[in-house]
């Protein structure tokens, strides 16, 4: 049997080749947690397992409502099989409530509800700190065509709408989320992950933070609240 090889290692995940099919890769979820462009780092045992299952849950449900994603299936507690997509170097952030970088950048009070979801785009580059870019930047540097930008944003809005509703029924507010996309078979698909690492989740009643802000802000209880998100979504089991 052919051995798999490491293709790429990021801050929170590793991609391995999938010898049985060159069009697929194995996505491995690490226990590492980072913030501020990797200037803050720790390891939280079990975090990768929780994020693997949470992301699989969201990806499967998004596919059920017609959103194309890279997800194929869960392989084990830490890994899932995904389509080998060509990365689009743009991160899409959708904000429903003022928090984090938006509050700091514009001097706004955290917790202010936006009249409509606000969409932002960032150039994906750790060395540059993922700078914000406009549609004109994206077009000027030929990262995407105008029709592709529009398609990506429509997908992002649909994802936000679906996740907001799903999380609301679990007593969780979707404050904001970061999405990544790629090309597969000449189509734009959702890639990467959807988890407390890539979203801001607040408890509906208490506004308690249930995401990576617990690590960023030294609030503690990262594992506890990640598990609580999984429990409320109905995917908590003995594996956790």
Curated annotation (Swiss-Prot):
GO CC, sorted alphabetically, is: cytosol
Question: Pfam families, from UniProt?
Answer: SAICAR_synt (PF01259)
Q: Which GO terms describe its molecular function?
A: ATP binding; phosphoribosylaminoimidazolesuccinocarboxamide synthase activity
E.C. number? 6.3.2.6
Give the record's keywords alphabetically.
ATP-binding, Ligase, Nucleotide-binding, Purine biosynthesis
Does this entry carry the keyword Glycoprotein? Answer: no
Task: Supply one GO BP term.
Answer: cobalamin biosynthetic process
**Reaction catalysed?**
5-amino-1-(5-phospho-D-ribosyl)imidazole-4-carboxylate + L-aspartate + ATP = (2S)-2-[5-amino-1-(5-phospho-beta-D-ribosyl)imidazole-4-carboxamido]succinate + ADP + phosphate + 2 H(+)
**What InterPro entries does the entry give?**
SAICAR_synt/ADE2_N (IPR028923), SAICAR_synt_PurC (IPR033934), SAICAR_synth (IPR001636), SAICAR_synthetase (IPR050089), SAICAR_synthetase_CS (IPR018236)
The pathway noted for it is: Purine metabolism; IMP biosynthesis via de novo pathway; 5-amino-1-(5-phospho-D-ribosyl)imidazole-4-carboxamide from 5-amino-1-(5-phospho-D-ribosyl)imidazole-4-carboxylate: step 1/2
Enzyme class name: ligase
Family note: Belongs to the SAICAR synthetase family.
Q: NCBIfam families from the entry?
A: purC
* This protein's name: Phosphoribosylaminoimidazole-succinocarboxamide synthase
What species is this protein from? Neorickettsia sennetsu (strain ATCC VR-367 / Miyayama)
What is the organism lineage in this UniProt record?
Bacteria, Pseudomonadati, Pseudomonadota, Alphaproteobacteria, Rickettsiales
